[in-house]
A protein has these predicted regions:
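Non-catalytic positions within long, well-ordered alpha-helices that form the structural scaffold/packing
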Residues: 95-98, 154
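Active-site mouth loops of central-metabolism enzymes
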Residues: 67-91, 109-110, 137-143
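Conserved, mostly hydrophobic/aromatic
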Residues: 2, 41, 54, 105, ...
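A structural motif
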Residues: 99-104, 158
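Metal- or metallocofactor-binding catalytic centers and their adjacent structured scaffolds
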Residues: 1-52
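N-terminal small/glycine-rich loop or linker at the start of catalytic domains
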Residues: 58-83, 119, 124-130
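Subtilisin-like serine protease catalytic core
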Residues: 52, 62-65, 177
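Catalytic core of soluble alpha/beta enzymes
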Residues: 107-179
Length: 179
């Protein structure tokens, strides 16, 4: 879909090409595959511009504002393991991420609310009480489940709770959002 639109175009016209592709894709939604496809084109265009000019991306977008950027380690992915094995692995991975010099860590959940709380407890044990950890749910909960997990994460001092419910679950969330 995108290739015929940009194949003979000058890749240095990054803004023009980006808007041309975006205008074609925006009717298909502003998330998911259309935007992921546009992101791939955008990255390629920036890469081409950097190679042609011999400049880093930071220089192309206005200059470097810092020499170091704090980053978090992402691990603790779900696998087909029994819960005790997952808990042990999550605790060990979290500890390893902390000892590697990251400023925080993020874990994946999605087994079920009670099991996920146990996994979060394992991560907290692995990193100790003074290290930020985040939880990525990828919309795996109903609102009631998200509230249950969210309260438990608050007790564990989780730094953030990402995407607990599907954004289109308007019926589920309307009772929990102040008018």
């Amino acid at each position: 879909v995108i290739q015929p639109m940009i194949l003979e175009e000058n890749p240095l016209n990054r803004d023009v090409l980006w808007h041309k592709v975006y205008n074609l894709l925006r009717d298909h939604g502003q998330k998911g595959m259309p935007i992921q496809a546009l992101s791939g084109v955008d990255i390629a265009l920036w890469d081409i511009l950097g190679k042609v000019t011999g400049l880093s991306i930071s220089r192309l977008i206005g200059g470097r504002f810092r020499e170091q950027v704090p980053v978090y380690g992402y691990g603790m992915m779900l696998r087909r393991e029994k819960l005790p094995a997952l808990m042990d692995r999550f605790e060990d991975e979290a500890a390893a991420i902390k000892s590697s010099g990251f400023v925080a860590t993020k874990m994946k959940v999605g087994l079920g609310s009670k099991q996920d709380v146990q996994l979060a407890e394992s991560v907290r044990r692995g990193v100790g009480g003074d290290f930020p950890f985040m939880v990525d749910a990828n919309h795996c909960y109903t609102v009631d489940q998200a509230l249950y997990v969210g309260r438990a994460l608050e007790e564990l001092d989780a730094y953030w709770f990402e995407e607990p419910v599907a954004p289109e679950d308007l019926d589920g969330t309307k009772n929990y959002v102040p008018s």
